[in-house]
């Protein structure tokens, strides 16, 4: 199972858009891989619709979406067709038809839950590094806005070499400002509050 900072495992997979090799085929792009327990299930259907409706947001961020479950390609295609016909939403991202081996390799099988994949999310950066992992129980659908926020936060942190507070960009203390890394030396600590806004030398922040 890949952990934070690990290379995303090399996977050769079959998808509704044809064969893919991950993360090679997406090198240079951020991607969000999310697994769902099964096709033709209510919670998963609401999630697919929600992901699709946020596609413009993900595209603005340069992020590719990929779904995954242990279902056959034909099942995926029939389900996608049902979503379009009944709900009026066309699913445009690829969906992986995984097997037990692939699911086990990335930690998606939950003991005691049969062969259904768990509700997981992996955010992977352009270098193929795992940057965020989320797991949800089968009974609870994901918050897609939080996944978008997490991608924005990771990209902002990488670009500006800063940390970001709780509920960013709407933090109750410092709003949309970013937290500056701790000073590396005693001398830097002494002048930190003269150069930046903050509560103490270890808690300084700035606008981006």
Swiss-Prot record:
Keywords: Antioxidant, Cytoplasm, Disulfide bond, Oxidoreductase, Peroxidase, Redox-active center. Residues 2-156 form the Thioredoxin domain. One of its GO terms (cellular component) is cytosol. Its EC number is 1.11.1.24. GO terms for molecular function: thioredoxin peroxidase activity. The keyword Calcium does not apply. Substrate binds at residue 119. GO terms for biological process: cell redox homeostasis; cellular response to stress; hydrogen peroxide catabolic process; response to oxidative stress. Its main location: cytoplasm. Homodecamer. Pentamer of dimers that assemble into a ring structure. It is found in: Cytoplasm. The active site is a conserved redox-active cysteine residue, the peroxidatic cysteine (C(P)), which makes the nucleophilic attack on the peroxide substrate. The peroxide oxidizes the C(P)-SH to cysteine sulfenic acid (C(P)-SOH), which then reacts with another cysteine residue, the resolving cysteine (C(R)), to form a disulfide bridge. The disulfide is subsequently reduced by an appropriate electron donor to complete the catalytic cycle. It comes from the Bacteria. It catalyses: a hydroperoxide + [thioredoxin]-dithiol = an alcohol + [thioredoxin]-disulfide + H2O. This is Peroxiredoxin.
């Amino acid at each position: 199972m890949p952990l934070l900072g690990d290379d995303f495992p090399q996977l050769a997979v079959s998808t509704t858009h044809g064969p893919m090799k991950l993360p090679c085929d997406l090198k240079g792009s951020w991607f969000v891989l999310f697994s769902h327990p099964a096709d033709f299930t209510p919670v998963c259907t609401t999630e697919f619709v929600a992901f699709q409706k946020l596609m413009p947001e993900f595209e603005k961020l340069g992020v590719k979406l990929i779904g995954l479950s242990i279902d056959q390609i034909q099942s995926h295609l029939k389900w996608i067709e049902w979503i379009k016909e009944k709900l009026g939403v066309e699913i445009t991202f690829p969906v992986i038809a995984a097997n037990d081996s692939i699911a086990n390799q990335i930690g998606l099988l939950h003991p005691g839950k049969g062969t259904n994949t768990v509700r997981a999310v992996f955010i992977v950066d352009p270098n193929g590094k795992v940057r965020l992992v989320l797991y949800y129980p089968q009974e609870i659908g994901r918050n897609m806005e939080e996944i978008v926020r997490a991608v924005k936060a990771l990209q902002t942190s990488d670009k500006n070499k800063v940390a970001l507070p709780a509920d960013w960009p709407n933090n109750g203390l410092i709003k949309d400002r970013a937290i500056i890394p701790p000073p590396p030396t005693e001398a830097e600590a002494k002048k930190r509050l003269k150069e930046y806004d903050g509560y103490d030398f270890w808690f300084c922040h700035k606008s981006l």
